[in-house]
Amino acid sequence: MPPGELIFSNLRSGSRPVPRDRDALSSVQSDAISTKSSARYNFQGTGSSDATSGTNVTIRNNTLSIGVSSQMQGSAFNGPRMQLSTNGLKNTQSKALQAQSQDGCQDSKNIADNDSDAEARTAKRSLELELAFHEARFSNEQVMVDISSIKGAKEGDLAELKTYRTSPGSKDKKLYFIVKDFDTETRRRLKSFQISVLSGQLQQVLDLPIRSKVWVKLKEKKQLAVDLVELHVKDSYVNRGDMWKFSTQLHDSCVFLGQRVGLIETVRATVKGIYINGKKIFSGYIDENTKIVFRSESAKLLFMIQITDEMWHFEENGEETFHKVVNSLFPKIFRKWKNIGTHHSISIMFCASIDRSDSSFNDVTSGERLKNTDDYYRAVVDQVNIVHWVEIMKTLRKEFIRIAQDLRNVKLNENVSVIKGSLPSVIKSNLLETINLATTLVTDPFKQNDLRHTTTHAIIVTAGSGLYDVDYDLLKITTQKLMSLEITMDLICLSRPPLHIVPLLRYRDYKDQLHYCTPTWLSISFWNDSSRANVEWRPRCKIYNVLMMGLTETELKEEIALQSIKINDKCNSVSDFMESYDSAAFEVQSGPYSMHMDAALAAEFRSSKESKNDWNRRTVSKSKGNTNHIDTITWMKPKSTNAVLQPAFKEKVFAQLSSSPNSNLPRTEFEYKNQMTATNSLALNTLKRLSHANSGVTQKIISKLFPDLAIKKSQSSLRQKANIQPTDLTGSSSSLSDTGSQYKRSPNPKLLHKQKQLFDDNKKEASCGTSILSSQSSGNQRVQDKNFLLSETSLKTSKPNNKPKNGIKGDSWIEIENPSVPVDAELASYLIPNRWKDVFPKYVAKKYTKWRSFTTPAELPLTTSMFPTPFDFEHQFSLRNHTVSLNIEQEGYQQSVFDLLQNMIYVRLLAGFQFCLGKNVTRVEKARDKDTDGSRITHLINKENYRDVSIYLRIDNEIHRIVCFDETIDVQKYIKHDDSKLLQSFAKYTPYVKTRYEVEYRELDLDPVKTRRESYNWNQIDQVLAGFNDTIMDPATQKRFRCKFVILPAEIPPNTFQSTINGRKETLTAEEIRLEGLRKIISSISRSRLRTEHEKKDKRSHKEEILPEVLFYTGYLFDFIEEHNDFLKNSGAAVKNSIFMEDAETLSKDADLTKIAYELQHGVYQIKLVNRKWHWKRHENCFIGLELVNWLIEHFSDVHTREDAVVYGQELMNKGLFHHVESRHGFLDGHYFYQLNPEFTTENKTLYKTSTKHSNESHLMRKISTSNKSESAKSIDPTISVESNQQSEDQITKPEEHSITVLLSNAVTVDLDPSRKSYKLETCIAHYDRVHNPDHCFHIRLEWLTATPKLIDDLISNWSRLAERYGLKLVEIPWDELCNIPKINPFHSFMNIKLAINPWQDLEFKDETIFREQKFFYHIYLLEKSGFLLDNRASKFFQSEKTNSYQIIYSWGKPMFKYAQYIHYTGSCMAEIRESGDFFLAPNNLHISRMNTGNIGSKASSHLKFTSDAQKIMLNFRKTCENYESLRDIFLEAKEKHIDNRVDLDEYTSFQSFNLYT
């Protein structure tokens, strides 16, 4: 163990050092233990290992004696006696000897306890076994043993494996594992071995060769169950439902540090921490009480930097406060990220509040907010990968220089601006408003998730010290909101820790009474960039104002004379001098009614240096004015110091000696007492004493610095439940504090919201594992030892004064009577919210977990002990219940009631619920049923124990109790009576925001305060999970996860252009290759559809060879639809439901060409020939290759696969049945046009019929009705329904009788886990376009509810790799249209662009013939000329006069886009055309964050191909739009093409001639 490296086992009772190895011999007690040697003491000497029989081991008075027999000469036992002390072995022997000796001591003690139990003695002995290794292909068990070699062992027992080494510097390992016997194959392969370890990671960790000696010993599970295990996830989105299954899977198993654990072989996590009793160990056993915490190495981090007046202040070293952020704080965090290898995505926002009033904020009373303020938020960095950290730092510096100028300059007119307003102090800043803005990112759990990042974490950086004035109503609203969200909040203070409790919020209630409280949902840290830790409080003084007013040392040298300080020769340091000075300053005065302390307590205080110093600094006296003879604590005036500015806060020291209430005293007498004690205050802002001869100089200095300030006597204000309330607390370094001299006496404080004792001895000890103190030091204590967080003295003496009052808000905040008094251990344990308490290991100081919050933030734990008492549960909650039964149709997918119950819990965890465990839950369950003992409450279920168990889940004010009886699941919802009037009556909060590319600040589109998580209809969600989708009345209310993808053209691989098919070399164009790629992706979607068990067993497997057809077109969409108008009018004709023909109707390859040609044209299921337009060419009476392949499979009994159909089709083509329209290709399966040769054409008549198979599934246009639904669109997914199929005719706007509904997309239920490796049915709904223009975007939309996100990500990755082979790119884009993004995410950057030329008004381009057909002709041309492709059409496009005869919808719903939306071919940015003709651009952060992987340590060149420079594209486009000459050239080019009739005005696209890579 390195020198000084200790683990603090108890935070608040002191910094008791604990050795890292608790099994060290120093822990052996001095009791005499003696044992005879046994055969198991086999020590490996220099040459061989011999069994000994004459050895005895004796431990007496910390002396270890080893008797060596004659047979042991020359062995490892030779040598002097080893002396034991509490510091360890003084004369160290080999590690093997130490460990074996320890085992001997422990086992000897067990033998002494029970000599008669020989079998138990044998079972607890270490056995030496020979090690082997096995591969994963034989067994996935980490450790396997030959049970016969371990007497008394059985499968499922817990065992310990130890390694011993004699080489210096090597470390022994202690690995725990569950006993698993050799299987038959392993026993045959490892005949001479007794234990085998899985090769690979564990083998590398143990670092042992084969046939090494290891020692195995059985252990008790209950004694070795660990408290907490930390799992780290990276580069994937792991939701809380999968975290729950992780916990279930790890139950009753063992893990070791660095172990990679997996869920369904695709979700990966790494074990990074195992804790037991405050100690981090290498390996441990997990039981039902072990907490599993998930931390993310690829999280979304949000930094909110508060821009206040203090940011421009200077530190002692001359550094500006803000520069600490960019010079030390962020670089240190980035280095931490680099060392860990994180892949975070970060956003940084400046948060400022401008006071527009003329008065100073000092005139505003404590706890009162500034009235005339405007809040501003500047998005500096928006979801940028940390690999760009150098650019991030440059941007931060530039924006900080400009922000004060931007905010304070107010434009009067175009050329005149004035400076107005000021930045207030951090105390008056907008903390709660900033927090509400950050929570807008996580209010909707069903939003479109980033599939590569887990967890959102907000970090607020401030120049203050943790003290804020807040609005009372806003505080209640904010805390209520945070109770239902999964976001964590950290506050980093750049100043030094103050002398009061932090974080501290001040507010005034409705009676204008001042309150102090500390929120539980805000974790605070103090940044210290020096190597010296903050072990003591150092007074500071602001000198900025002194210098600016000319009050320098030169001017005051004649007025100020400093009395020479007489240094005590006995003082060896400044700290000692200060201690001596304080001891002399505070003398103990004895009055006629002096208090007598308990002798034992006094001795305890004097026993330590810390307590002795505290004792000397405290004064116990009797106040002269107290007629009731009540003892008080009085601070004596230092002999050479007068009060400066105002009386200082006097720290409450001996709280149990404080006086009882003075409410019975007259107010005038009480005020007089405070006026008297005010002169005895100590000024804390200086270390120098002013001379007695110059006592008036102080007033001179003050009058110059603060001319309006008069030194007043301290005035106290009485409160209902306390004699004295602090009247002022400022967070600035020069501020002084003030408090009265009397305190309310309360010897035994109890939390008022707890009516019974909550802390037994064990729990009280556990509560010490957390601390409100920062990573450096808390300011609560003036003097403390370096290794102490809270001394025992301060815990005992401060306990009575800081008891919570009636104002305590449960798990939200705790009111503090006197912030200057440290809290006790009981109260401090409540300063971490119950929802997050499981994140922190017990007995581990919180300062050791601070960095992990910044580097690897934790997800909300799965369990919580927060639960109402039985009384509150009965009187404050109302009951609503519903029952759920599984739809019998789900049995076709092998679904059971257990799967339904599992999915119901899964979805609730996704929505933010937590499992409720603890005493209150048990009490409530017992109160419900007198016959139960509460043992049936659980959170881990499996197929054996899920019936008749109670599962409690809670979020905010909603509690669900779920119980499964037989085949029915009963859900009881308990809703707490919540007063929502406060939120409704709260004034609208409208801040100003400026995103990354904006030029001016604008009003925010949403109200952050009133944006909160909505309540869900759980009855509806549960019914959907059960498979009753048809009962849903409003599909829009269904909750699901969604993501949207577009397929864009990309660079085509060189070897793709030529291929050999049927022995013929085919050369394809770029367009044909990309169309073939789309067909392959659609084929992949179709083949992966979910099938019932009956369908899987269907022998007619060639049904799967029939692929859905996607109709490609060029030109105008409605022209394409109009060409099929005749077919639409006759779409009601009866057709055969089955896609297969009867045996009598089938053909074979032996059929002659005449018969085949007739069946093709005139058969019952013929291919209708249609006229097809492709670009500017029109082909008469043709069909496509895909149609013929499907037709051959359907109609030929000896054609079973698509490959067979292509080969046979080529034969027919060679025989002259048909030919390619341009004679460029042979017969190909895809979008290739073919015509029958004239000799086989029996009727030269064009039939307007789509060439597709005759089934309801393949019709292009169909009416939506309950009797005519596509099989592919049916909601056979048990977890989600297809929205379009649930829309009845009443829900959809009914068209006129002659109108026809046109469906432009298909919906398929995709099976994400065909091999059934998952623990649940993994499905999603895939919507894809069935009508597509190759010059536009092809769309794929996914919807799911209970699918594992990693499987969704894997599916997308497979599609992406497939697309790249054909010159395509799969790009994720927002589900919502672009104009709605600022309403959802206020941090998202965008830019509004106004054209330098308005083509509608400019005479050079104003042409009514163009605008009559296409108003945005020039805008579309500009976008497509710049590389943008059409994504979505505006809804008005589908509501034009040309669409009166039909209604267009999609399988995912009706198109509701307000504007036409385009996306750049790189996928990095998107654009919209507004009605005004302006452009709205925004970066596509979903695609950028998905592609930009890597950490800070990676080389920049390795990320060039993944990084999409959206900023460069957007800035270049804006430059073009705002440059008159550049824009004019593009518009002239567009006009010229129009004159030459080379464009289609209705739906123009120039992308076909646009070179992507020039």
UniProtKB/Swiss-Prot annotation:
Compositional bias annotation for Low complexity: 728-741
Region annotation (Disordered) ranges: 9-31, 71-119, 717-752, 1258-1294
GO molecular function, one term: GTPase activator activity
Residues annotated as domain DEP: 1163-1238
Annotated keywords: Membrane, Vacuole
A GO cellular component annotation in the UniProt record: vacuolar membrane
Superkingdom of origin organism: Eukaryota
Sequence similarity: Belongs to the IML1 family.
Record's protein name: Vacuolar membrane-associated protein IML1
Organism, scientific name: Kluyveromyces lactis (strain ATCC 8585 / CBS 2359 / DSM 70799 / NBRC 1267 / NRRL Y-1140 / WM37)
